[in-house]
Amino acid sequence: MKTPAALQALIDDGVIDEVLRPLKSGKEAAVYVVRSGDDIRCAKVYKDMAQRSFQQRVQYQEGRKVRGSREARAIGKATKYGRKQQETAWKNAEVDALYLLRDAGVRVPEPHGYYHGVLVMALVTDADGFSAPRLGEVELDPDQARDFHAVLMRQVVRMLCCGLI
């Protein structure tokens, strides 16, 4: 596998040692399994605005804050500088939310840092060390489903208390 340029920068800086494999690619980012020392982690490489494919971008980014009035004006006018600032604000908001949720006790992957537009975090695995399945791929009996629902609702309450949902 050819190492993506964004991850090569992290290898060059000593943040990660090796890219093991791609894990998932979605509308906003591609996630790779990486090795950092003895630890296996994942690296979320955010796609540039031109590469993202989701339709409701305006609603998705609604309410994002930027640093100053110059940035806000540039974003409002959709200048090249403004689009770059909007992109930076979006990526920073995603990373900040992960740290905020973690600090509030929400079960999220442990973040290990944000470097050059790449979020490095813990890889969530099952008991055998394989990447954890997506929720839609898990089969639960009714009792397990009720138990997981109760856990999920407690997590949602914590997110509400943070003001993120």
Language-model region placement:
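Conserved kinase catalytic-core segment
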Residues: P142-I165
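Conserved ATP-binding subdomain of kinase catalytic cores across diverse folds
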Residues: M1-S131, V157, C161
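Active-site oxyanion-binding pockets that recognize sulfate/phosphate
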Residues: Y81-K84, V138-P142
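AlphaC helix of the protein kinase catalytic domain
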Residues: G129-L140
